[in-house]
Amino acid sequence: MSFISETIIIGTGGAVRLTGSGLGCSDWPLCTPDSLVPILEVQGIHGIIEFGNRLMTGVVGIIALAVVLLVLHLFSGKRGLVNALWFALGGIVAAVATFAIATPLHFPASPIALAVLLVAVIAAAVRSVRTTPARRDLVLLAWLTLIGVVAQALVGGITVLTGLNPFIVGFHYTSSLLLVCITAAFLVRLKTSPGPRERAVPVWFAAVTHVTGLALAVTIVFGVLTTGSGPHSGDADVLRHGFDATVLAHVHSWPGYILAALVLFLTVSAWVLRLEPRRWLLVLVLAILVQVGVGIWQAREGLPPLLVGTHMVLASLSAAAYTVVVLRLKRPVPVDA
């Protein structure tokens, strides 16, 4: 559920940007200075779309919190669960106190209070990972997801308060991709036996796989910059990066083609050598090829919102598939009979 919700919120966040609804709610955490929810007669459909995305953040956060509590219950026992709840209560109290102090001083109370809550969540995560006797990998990944969701809420608020600064918007999207990868890693490790792991592929194959990851990262970064320079900035009055979108589109495509070639090479090699990650490489190569096709199509059609949104979601699925491939480079060490 956490993986699905993280992927969905990339789609809803993309819808906010592609419909020009980024400032549909002009304030944060309220929609307007006087109202928590949008007023249809004032904000129109843009306010509804932006507020819907904010509600989705709450859903993602609840699911992430539920995963943390479930993992702690399974692997830390009652004591670990109670400790986490005490940290949560302390974080909420500290955040409320911070808000109460910052408001009369005319400081940005909401972002500061949320930052205090984020620190409390990080502290709880560190303690949980250190004290959990088993499956610390799952505990860590669950906490990282929750930390990421809280951090994303803070970044989302800053995005609105800065008038959709294109660099912050790009960071917001990239961070969402990382959360999708973390939740994908959680699912893989959940189905993997604990204990020591050993390399399951040749050294050269692992090296090429990591180079492929670099190509994927570069492709995503230039894709974010390209979108920030194009027509979909999130609001008609918001300034873009100032870069030439046409030039960036070509630059974005170069590492994309390199990425496709590397993934195709890895896929063929994995199937010929019958290596562990071969099935997920097949998923990855199909995702990348579809991604390349959608990218070319949207460029030729003048960047229609639906295709751009599809391109954004496919990028998250490609990153998730690559994460699974990397984790399949190793396997649990066989236990001697």
Where are the regions that the model predicts?
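N-terminal signal-anchor transmembrane alpha helix
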Residues: 1-20, 215-225
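Hydrophobic cores of alpha-helical transmembrane segments in multi-pass inner/ER membrane proteins
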Residues: 59-67, 113-125, 176-191, 255-265, ...
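Extracytosolic (periplasmic/ER-lumenal) interhelical loops and adjacent juxtamembrane/interface segments
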Residues: 17-51, 228, 236-241
